């Protein structure tokens, strides 16, 4: 009897170990299946809202891919890429930054650039404002303005519009026009120079500044906070083109590069284009 008991005990131990090993293997397989491939997207601040919707739509068919977004001014993002920051896709709010990266060897993956969207600069005020400003021609009536810096695309377009409207002096590089020069041209108005278009939107919608210049797409979902005074004509700003491209990420493995390519293909797809339109972008 003792021998049988010992035998049964030994069998129980062996079975327990086998079950434990099998359980560990299944756990490892489940963990591996849950691991996601990360794609890092550097996108202009004005794309923040629409990108959230795009990522949600993309993940319906690609649950295995995690999109991580870095949103800031296109100039700041370009500098980060030039300095070697890990990035798979760059979505700029202007061609200047993408052109500069294309002029450098080994940054943009050949054949992946798409000049995809068009936007429009707007002059806005906060709801309930008593401003006398009606548009770019009488911006000097504002006591304070929120305007992005010259290295920020919306700031550059604003400066270009002021030059073409005859308010600012013509210059070789409008990006170099300082806020002091703008303030002087507008009769001494207080200028709040913002780091990106999101900061301009916040400054005006919260009433910190009387008027500001943002993109039309930035007014999406802000109808109860922002009032559009003027859609600035393209004749003054030039086209507001958004290019997108895949970046040579030296830290990425082949799986990550493939996932980045799939996401880029989605960004230029007909499905994505309908989403852009919902968020007030035009298709180039």
Residue ranges and their predicted role:
Residues 2-11:
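Bacterial N-terminal signal peptides that target proteins for export
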Residues 19-23:
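C-terminal motif of bacterial Sec signal peptides marking the signal peptidase cleavage site
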Residues 69-79, 87-102:
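Ligand-binding clamshell of periplasmic/extracellular solute-binding protein-like
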Residues 96-109, 114:
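Acidic, polar ligand-binding/catalytic clefts
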